[in-house]
Amino acid sequence: MITIKNITLNDPLIIASGIIPDVPNYVETICEKYKPSAITTKTVTLNPLEPHKPPTVIKLHDGIYMNAIGLGNPGAKAINEIGVLCPLIVSVGGSSINEIKEVVEVVQSKAKIIEINVSSPNRKGYGESLSKLIGDIIESVKSVTKLPVFVKLGPWDNVIELAGKALEKGADGLTLINTIKGLIIDVETFKPILYYGTGGVSGRCLYPIALRIIKDVYEEYGVDIIGVGGVYDWTDVIGMLAAGAKLVGLGTVLIEKGFSVIEEIRKGLQSYLLEKGLKFEDIIGISVRK
């Protein structure tokens, strides 16, 4: 069992944002059939947002993708149509502080945790563009909700500084990390393959970067962290817990292997804990304490 902000979950395995479309029946089916400890929704904005034109996703190598969907979503009200069969972490976004606050007001009745996305690299005016306003965003959101508020940050050089600003203004935790902005050129046309141009690189290559940032931030602040980035098997989960994460988001691995991999990873974790005589709580942050 894992407790995060008075929410008790069976284990640390959650589904990361961007994997499951905000289609109520689909979310409910995944909850019921595969039993993740929680699902993070795709980032929702106040009003529907059209995705970028295709191509929006390309596979670079096994376990490595690049996407520029551009936060396309059906709007915040769609969240309220989801029948909650497992805890929802609702990812919220917007092009202004006020929009983000309004989204939180709309979705909070369905959420266990609010995750503010200020790190998407794939839409001008959204996500990463607002990271410099993180303190003001947190203050605004905390004025309208009593739910735990986490902030999703990117793999930036100033991530520790931004994490500190978010926590200083009342953030309850952090989600680390979002994708890394990348570019692939078509050698026939000499143009970017993705319609948007750049895209967020995700998958296995992200894991050591995510692990380093999680450890650095946990060492600095000792805060609750949802670790995301390149997790592919149970050993990766243990690594993230050891670095300081309390929950671990599965993303690209679900695209590559399907949702049944959740149970495969879960069994690996259970066998490891049994063999070592440990609980999840014993492992969280252990690499920082050594």
UniProtKB/Swiss-Prot annotation:
The Enzyme Commission number assigned here is: 1.3.1.14
**Which residues are listed for FMN binding in this entry?**
S17, K42, T43, N117, K152, I177, G203, G229, G230, G251, T252
| Active-site residues annotated for this sequence | S120 (nucleophile)
Q: Please give a single GO biological process term from the UniProt record.
A: 'de novo' UMP biosynthetic process
Query: Pathway, per UniProt?
Result: Pyrimidine metabolism; UMP biosynthesis via de novo pathway; orotate from (S)-dihydroorotate (NAD(+) route): step 1/1
**Location within or outside the cell:** Cytoplasm
Q: Which reaction does it catalyse?
A: (S)-dihydroorotate + NAD(+) = orotate + NADH + H(+)
Specify the protein name.
Dihydroorotate dehydrogenase B (NAD(+)), catalytic subunit
Provide the primary localization: cytoplasm
Q: Which UniProt keywords apply?
A: Cytoplasm, Flavoprotein, FMN, NAD, Oxidoreductase, Pyrimidine biosynthesis
- One annotated GO molecular function: dihydroorotate dehydrogenase (NAD+) activity
Cofactor note text: Binds 1 FMN per subunit.
To which protein family does this belong?
Belongs to the dihydroorotate dehydrogenase family. Type 1 subfamily.
What is the role of the protein in this entry?
Answer: Catalyzes the conversion of dihydroorotate to orotate with NAD(+) as electron acceptor.
- Spell out the Pfam families in the cross-references: DHO_dh (PF01180)
Assembly and oligomerization: Heterotetramer of 2 PyrK and 2 PyrD type B subunits.
Specify which residues bind substrate according to the UniProt entry for this protein: K42, N67, A68, I69, G70, L71, N117, N178, T179
Question: InterPro entries from the xrefs?
Answer: Aldolase_TIM, DHO_dehydrogenase, DHOD_1B, DHODH_Type1, Dihydroorotate_DH_1, Dihydroorotate_DH_1_2, Dihydroorotate_DH_cat, Dihydroorotate_DH_CS
One cellular component term (GO) for this entry is: cytoplasm
